[in-house]
């Protein structure tokens, strides 16, 4: 490896955002020599590839574009990790960007660091760049810790804050699930059983965009992507099941299980409440429910206690399990009318 840091940018139909993203990575010449920017074009149908290739002749020692067939988010991470030349590796989504000044300071400090995982701050912004919220860590900065101390602290690590040592990921044979979105959860949790050392550098590097229409976190997209969460959760359960007894004793395992429970409740709610009553995925939710009953009985039990609202304590998952039908709020309205008006 002859680079200090590799930035992997999974890219699919991002022509409207890619210039902003890539321009934010333009650093002073000396730092550019230490940086590898790898744009993994995931079969984009717009001008994303053309835009990305514009940077190669201008910065041939830094920018590199990989054009490949569509395989979704995880396939881009896997390809980037396979070919990364940096001692460290970080993910940047193509519709997000870095604060260039903070990134430059981070690169300067990174030269003097030797750790399996580095944490930095990030900010959540809207598509116009307006600040929504800031995220930092209540951890002593600029001090190398044994990662076990972080695990025991209960701190949650966001994908946007994490940089990993590339060799560590390769040694644990890290591989992200392909063919689906939302696998950034894997990037946060899976490598942690291989991390021995960690340091927190309080630079506000990452700008994470929330609210852009069409992004994977858009509510309309989420409603159509429940099958991705189904596959992700099955992969997470399989990963957790195969951890060693020693790894299962660590706080990381508890966080994985908590995330499995949290995301599972989202699948139930999406299928049984949010999706259109006439078009929800009946086969998927039945298979998912059976899977959770067998693999995670406690999650299955907790799902049965889910209610629509605090003021409407209807256990909609339990109702569906008993009747095979989704609970309809219309039923409450009709019952009220019959009682109140005799209709």
Please provide the spans of the model-predicted regions.
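Cell-envelope/extracellular polymer assembly enzymes that use nucleotide-activated donors
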Residues: 4-6, 36, 186
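Short, acidic, metal-binding catalytic loop of nucleotide-sugar glycosyltransferases
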Residues: 23-34
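A conserved acidic beta->alpha catalytic loop
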Residues: 24, 41-50, 70
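Short beta-strand/loop segment that forms part of the nucleotide-sugar
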Residues: 33-43, 64-69, 94
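Glycine-rich, basic loop-to-helix element that forms the pyrophosphate-binding segment
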Residues: 68-84
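Donor-binding/catalytic cores of nucleotide-activated saccharide
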Residues: 73, 77, 94-202, 206-224
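Short aromatic/hydrophobic "clamp" motif used to bind/position activated sugar donors
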Residues: 89
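Membrane-interface aromatic/basic loop that binds lipid-linked glycans or pyrophosphate carriers
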Residues: 115, 272-343
